[in-house]
Amino acid sequence: VLNFGHTFGHAFESLALEKGCPMPHGVCIAHGIVSALVLSHLRLDCPSELLHRIAKEIVAPYYKTPAFTCDDYPRLLELMRSDKKNAIAGQILFVLLRNKAIPEIDVPADDREIAAALDITRDLLGS
């Protein structure tokens, strides 16, 4: 459960470093939590109210939005695949939430689902 948001967050952090605009680890993880909540909603029907509250009331007002576009998705996916937590070759695994305090661990998601989560994250956070 400790890794909630980290698969996305570490990819955001690595991409920011590659682009020459490093962002603090905590900021990247905060945005990763929003992406993980989006994916939780898409995959596990986590309540949208929880997602919107975290995104709009907690993350967006206080953290600079990571600058990524859909052109960055292939690189973000590559970074996620190389994450040390993804032990199953080729699969990207996530800690997701069914609801507040009800986690699911090692939930696989395909590229299409991850891209959809990234699109929605960008919409929610104004990227």
Report each predicted region and the residues it spans:
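Active-site segments that bind and position negatively charged phosphate/pyrophosphate groups
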Residues: 1-74
